[in-house]
Regions:
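Acidic, metal-dependent phosphodiester-chemistry machinery of nucleic-acid enzymes
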Residues: 1-275, 279, 283-288, 316, ...
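Active-site-proximal structural scaffolding
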Residues: 274, 278, 304, 315, ...
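Extended, hydrophobic alpha-helical segments in both membrane/secreted and soluble proteins
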Residues: 281, 307-311, 322
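A short acidic/basic microdomain associated with nuclease active sites
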Residues: 286-307, 311-314
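Active-site beta-strand-loop-beta-strand hairpin of nuclease catalytic cores
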Residues: 313-333
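Hydrophobic/aromatic beta-strand patches that form the interior of the parallel beta-sheet core
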Residues: 320-322, 378-380, 405
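Catalytic cores of nucleic-acid endonucleases
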Residues: 326-378
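Short acidic, S/G/P-rich loop/turn micro-motifs used as interaction or catalytic elements
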Residues: 328-329, 384-387
Length: 488
């Protein structure tokens, strides 16, 4: 007797019974249940408590509902227990599906695939990425092409956008509903003007049919993506707003400018953004107290011809070369893919950076005093790509001698703090290895490497428009908790 072989189901096959189960309920109640579940999850302080609720699966429930037409749903009200049943069914179904059966992925990429969707719900929530946008604006002239691209997209002065966004950022984890109370909305409108507020709401609120159309095309990579709804932090249907939790809103706001630049396809604006980010990175490195060579310095000192790195730090025990790239997590970057696909995606960023760093390293090694010193090649990215060890991307023959590390600017700033004057760079290798280990083993960030900077009303005052109503602004600051202790 021949036994039939039961083949694992595909992603679409796996989620179909979950979607059928969801369709037994009223459409609004499904969206409400998912939204409330994510809001309640945000209120849990400990990351382990948040993780235990599988909030990233609840996000997928919302995505699948938004992809459906409301007419496909019935009339029973979905309870939180009903939602949990859908979450568990999806979790268990995916566990047994074929989405895990892609062979040949290096261990770091497999770990990334397993954990990437969970990370936003387990990270410490600092405001470093938000603060960098303020710093970026301070570097731009009023007629900058980059400023024009950003402001054309948001429909207001970029500083005003960040002012308004900060109040939502502060309310995202606890009290997001307060922002839409009539008194709060009235105060916002008085402070910033009705035109600015209308423009801002257009950037964060998306009609259901628009979100559904954008989500129409999908594959199994959807299951592994972080913040699948970051483009639509609020969705509107028949006058009701649905909110998908703090991680989605934070991601939307913190990377607003870099996303705008990436989608605009404007070479001048893109270059201006990269120049500003490069300058910011250089200033962060100089905080270490060690001499920092910029590209011109590196070319002169080591007679570098061809591709060159942005920065170099030289110490008695090590040489570190840095290349800065404006790259961060987004939906066009696969969460689960082959090495070759990642190489294609990173051809103009990470792989190009590696070529620049390798060329500099080869020139440095020609100088006798550097022959036996370790050279660390570091690619600094705008956001954390969570790629773990990078040898699968850069399998060049010098890999063992000159390891390549991909660090976000947040991680780099954490390292800079660790090597402030009084600490030698002899320990840098261990610090870099810690970052790699953090990605590979503890990507849930139980010991987060996060931004060192906090911004409160101090940063708000930096971008505050003096033409705004000061009394209204002070009222908003007190309502939003903008006067929190700077150690927060």
């Amino acid at each position: 007797m021949t036994k039939s072989i039961v083949r694992p189901m595909s992603y679409r096959q796996t989620i179909k019974p979950v979607r059928n189960r969801m369709r037994k309920f009223d459409y609004h109640s499904v969206l409400t249940a998912a939204s409330n579940y994510l809001i309640e999850t945000d209120a849990h302080g400990a990351d382990r408590e948040r993780a235990a609720r599988l909030p990233w699966v609840a996000e997928r429930i919302a995505v699948w509902a938004l992809r459906d037409e409301p007419s496909m749903y019935r009339h029973a009200k979905m309870s939180q227990n009903d939602l949990r049943a859908c979450i568990n069914q999806a979790w268990n179904g995916i566990d047994a599906s074929d989405v895990w059966r892609k062979s040949g992925h290096p261990l770091p990429l497999f770990m990334r695939q397993c954990l990437l969707a969970q990370v936003p719900h387990q990270q410490n929530r600092g405001m470093g990425a938000f603060a960098r946008q303020i710093d970026l604006l301070s570097r731009l002239k009023s007629n900058s092409r980059l400023r024009q691209v950003i402001e054309n997209h948001v429909g207001m002065r970029a500083e005003v956008y960040l002012q308004v966004a900060m109040f939502l950022w502060l309310k995202a984890s606890v009290g997001i509903g307060d922002v839409f109370e009539p008194a709060y909305l009235e105060t916002l409108t008085r402070a910033f003007g009705p035109g600015a507020m209308q423009s801002f709401w257009r950037t964060v609120i998306t009609p259901r049919h628009v979100a559904g159309l954008a989500l129409k095309d999908f594959d199994d990579d959807e299951w592994f993506q972080p913040n699948v709804l970051y483009r639509f932090p609020f969705v509107e249907l028949h006058g009701r707003l649905y909110f998908w939790g703090a991680p989605c809103l934070h991601r939307h706001i913190e990377f607003a400018f870099s996303d705008i630049v990436a989608n605009a396809k404007d070479k001048t604006a893109k270059q201006a953004f990269e120049d500003a980010f490069e300058a910011y990175t250089g200033e962060s490195l100089r905080r270490s107290g060690f001499p920092v060579l910029d590209e011109d310095d590196v070319r002169r000192r080591f007679q570098v011809g061809g591709p060159c790195s942005d920065f170099m730090v030289i110490e008695d025990d090590a040489t570190i070369v840095f290349e800065v790239k404006n790259k961060s997590l987004s939906l066009d970057l696969p969460a689960s893919a082959s090495v070759n696909k990642y190489k294609t995606k990173f051809k103009e960023t990470l792989l190009k950076a590696n070529t620049q760093l390798a060329n500099v390293a080869s020139h440095v090694r020609k100088v006798p005093e550097f022959v036996n010193k370790p050279i660390h090649r570091v690619i600094v990215t705008y956001g954390d790509l969570m790629l773990g060890r990078s040898d699968y991307l850069f399998p060049d023959e010098d890999q063992a001698r000159d390891p390549v590390l991909i660090l976000s600017i947040d991680e780099l700033e954490q390292i800079v703090e660790a090597v402030l004057p009084g600490t030698t760079l002899a320990d840098v290798d261990q610090l870099f290895r810690y970052c790699v280990w953090q990605h590979l083993i503890e990507i849930d960030m139980t010991r987060p490497i996060g931004p060192r900077c906090s911004i409160t009303v101090l940063y708000v005052s930096t971008i505050y428009d003096s033409n705004s109503n000061e009394a209204d602004f002070a009222q908003l600051s007190s309502q939003s908790g903008a006067g929190l202790d700077a150690r927060h």
